[in-house]
Amino acid sequence: MAKIVKVIGREIIDSRGNPTVEAEVHLEGGFVGLAAAPSGASTGSREALELRDGDKARFLGKGVLKAVAAVNNEIAQALVGKDATNQAEIDQIMIDLDGTENKSKFGANAILAVSLANAKAAAAAKGMPLFAWIAELNGTPGQYSMPLPMMNIINGGEHADNNVDIQEFMIQPVGAKTLKEALRIGAEVFHNLAKVLKGKGLSTAVGDEGGFAPNLESNAAALACIKEAVEKAGYVLGKDVTLAMDCASSEFYNKENGMYEMKGEGKSFTSQEFTHYLEELCKEYPIVSIEDGQDESDWEGFAYQTKVLGDKVQLVGDDLFVTNTKILKEGIEKGIANSILIKFNQIGSLTETLAAIKMAKDAGYTAVISHRSGETEDATIADLAVGTAAGQIKTGSMSRSDRIAKYNQLIRIEEALGDKAPFLGLKAVKGQA
């Protein structure tokens, strides 16, 4: 038994200068797990609650001392003496103790930090890497793959202070044979994109996720800049590198009139028109994945989009599904989208995250492991992607060490596993196998 002897919570700072919760779980034998909760900017309305203090005199109201107090008091008291290797029990104790539907008593940020720290401590006690322990918890011991990176190299929407409506324009280095080679291709395209933007007199300042955030006349202009950068780097768009977008449509959906209002372009679309707008972009560019291509509440729009694009494009639900098995189950039954974005803190525990990944895979949906726009140096999502053989990861661009920490962890894991963790490339993307 790997008995928990101490649980510690503290307030640390994330990549946006906001506080977040870090937790330590100490076991008998001196084993320790350390983990921090990330934080989102464009959030789904049905996400588990991130508890903030609301005290405007501290961190503009964004302090997390209440969540930290929950870790150091109620959660610590409930977990001391328990077996850290029983992850499902540890998570359930915290969920039951919180007692709310959306973890609003303690905060998903408190519960998640402890959940992940516990998994790390248990892995240490077992003498195995975190990815291997996650595979055991997932019921798939020894089954690994290296994920295809979806690298957000132009940021818009809530992730940047510019006029671009679509939140993320991503590249996928599908021509690579290994994860390490994929990162090299991504870095080369990223540096060439800087040259392209500078050549047009555009800003090369970066957004929250490390991508460039220039003012552009249209979303198509962002794709055109990326195409030029790919070619300048010596690669073929559609063969070596494919494209993906996160529309984050809820951010520009007008609930009052049911229109998608893209202020940056001065365009307004009905739900079906917006699907056809995206369809035209897919015809012009090799876009193989679109995330949140409709508002999270527009299930009728999603059903239509899935009918029109679902057989050739991966349609990822983020705000749509919020890593929640109840919502995902309904989506699967109604044929909504064909992929889910996986964010730990949308649901608030490792056990529930693994359940969402399993449900998606069992239904033939893909699962894309994702960071949040507010991150720390915690690289747990790298181990999650490998340990669940998810096949795809979104963890930002080729700048900002809060993003690079995850890529560097993937490099280490690939080196350790060798051919036991194949890099699937484009085969990992729904509709592209």
UniProtKB/Swiss-Prot annotation:
Mg(2+) binds at residues 246, 291, 318. Keywords: Cytoplasm, Glycolysis, Lyase, Magnesium, Metal-binding, Secreted. It catalyses: (2R)-2-phosphoglycerate = phosphoenolpyruvate + H2O. Its cofactor is Mg(2+). Belongs to the enolase family. (2R)-2-phosphoglycerate binds at residues 167, 343, 372-373, 394. One of its GO terms (cellular component) is phosphopyruvate hydratase complex. One of its GO terms (molecular function) is phosphopyruvate hydratase activity. The active site is at 209 (proton donor), 343 (proton acceptor). GO terms for biological process: glycolytic process. NCBIfam families: eno. Catalyzes the reversible conversion of 2-phosphoglycerate (2-PG) into phosphoenolpyruvate (PEP). It is essential for the degradation of carbohydrates via glycolysis. It is an enzyme of class 4 (lyase). Binds a second Mg(2+) ion via substrate during catalysis. It is found in: Cytoplasm; Secreted; Cell surface. Pathway: Carbohydrate degradation; glycolysis; pyruvate from D-glyceraldehyde 3-phosphate: step 4/5. This is Enolase. InterPro entries: Enolase, Enolase-like_C_sf, Enolase-like_N, Enolase_C, Enolase_CS, Enolase_N. Component of the RNA degradosome, a multiprotein complex involved in RNA processing and mRNA degradation.
